[in-house]
Amino acid sequence: MNLISIESSTDLCSVSSFKKGNLYNVIDLVDSKEHSKNLPHIILRAMNDFEDYSKIEAFAVSIGPGSFTSVRIALSIVKGLAFGLKNNIIPVSTLEAMNYSVNDKGIHYVSINSFKNKCFIQKFKGSVVLAPPFISNIEDIGNLDNRVYLYSNNSIEQNCHLISPSSISLAEYAIINYSRLVKKYNDDINPIYLSENEFVKINDNKSK
């Protein structure tokens, strides 16, 4: 599959191009305040890896949870491009894409340090989602009952395995789950937004 993959849920902005299902090029930038300025340019650079834009079959894009503003920017750009090219869109949960890069068949958590002392967390067993994502205090991560794979741009004292969002793992996850995730260019696609209503303390029953 030929596709463009965009990950913008954190301060890391990552765009990659895939040709026939294989990675061709990747561009990574770190500056969440500049996503609105940088994203259009690096997406265009990735698209220019194809001599003819008609060869691009789909756009894979992260839909959060994460930086809601950055996710909306990327999704808006992708919707516009897909509408013009009549391409499919593959919306992908950021935490599920990150989990794809984790080689852990047991029960574990994947987390993103989202803002201030809060983080988004989701529970998995191998590649299987065990529970919806929720918000909690990052200092409570140490109270979780299983391994935690975390992305954070802050110094974390907890015993976590550090990982990073990537347009590469997002694309690979999108390709494998294409038939389940794919949307038409004119379908309704919305970011995953978690509010304080989803805030859960780690030692609450909801987080188990």
Tell what function each PLM region has.
Residues N25-D28:
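Short amphipathic
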Residues V30-N38, F68, R72, P165:
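Residues at secondary-structure transition points
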Residues R45, K79, F83, Y100-S101, ...:
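Short, well-ordered alpha-helices that flank and scaffold nucleotide-derived cofactor binding pockets
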